[in-house]
């Protein structure tokens, strides 16, 4: 399996995606389901497929993704990051193109923690003058 599969790990928010690429027909499975079935929203599917579309490899690879943690948006972003890393593992000459589009860089934004004495991370209690 290691010889023919290229892999990459992607992260976004609290989601982690392990991606495996193999030369094939363009079938994408996420956690054992088809990508259309797993991601309900069309925008999430588009986000996940962006690196393959950019490099014109949408029909060239079979992609198998294991993703856990976070929500739909984070999982789609993690899948995109993982596919990008797997493509670079397959062909390093794709890195400048993917980097120019901003897919190689890990989006480091995380949820800010809730502080004591506040409603949420920054929301204060309502001030009453009287």
Swiss-Prot record:
Gene name per UniProt: rpsI
Entry-linked Pfam families? Ribosomal_S9
Which HAMAP family does the record match to this protein? Ribosomal_uS9_B
SUPFAM superfamilies listed in its UniProt record? Ribosomal protein S5 domain 2-like
Please provide the Gene Ontology terms (biological process) for this protein: translation
The record's listing under InterPro entries reads:
Ribosomal_Su5_D2-typ_SF (IPR020568), Ribosomal_uS9 (IPR000754), Ribosomal_uS9_bac/plastid (IPR023035), Ribosomal_uS9_CS (IPR020574), Ribsml_uS5_D2-typ_fold_subgr (IPR014721)
Indicate the family of this protein: Belongs to the universal ribosomal protein uS9 family.
Which segments cross the bilayer?
Answer: none
Q: Which protein is depicted?
A: Small ribosomal subunit protein uS9
Report one GO cellular component. cytosolic small ribosomal subunit
Q: Which UniProt keywords apply?
A: Ribonucleoprotein, Ribosomal protein
The record lists the organism as Variovorax paradoxus (strain S110)
**One of the record's GO molecular function terms:** structural constituent of ribosome
């Amino acid at each position: 399996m290691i010889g023919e599969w290229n892999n990459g790990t992607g992260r976004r928010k609290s989601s982690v995606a392990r991606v495996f690429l193999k030369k094939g027909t363009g079938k994408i499975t996420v956690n054992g389901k088809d990508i259309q079935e797993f991601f309900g929203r069309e925008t999430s599917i588009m986000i996940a497929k962006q690196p393959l579309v950019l490099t014109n490899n949408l029909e060239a690879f079979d992609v198998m993704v294991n993703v856990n943690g976070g929500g739909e948006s984070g999982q789609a972003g993690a899948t995109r990051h993982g596919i990008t890393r797997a493509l670079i593992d397959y062909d390093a000459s794709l890195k400048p193109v993917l980097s120019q589009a901003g897919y190689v860089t890990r989006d480091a934004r995380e949820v800010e923690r809730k502080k004591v004495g506040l409603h949420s991370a920054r929301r204060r209690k309502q001030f009453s003058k009287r």
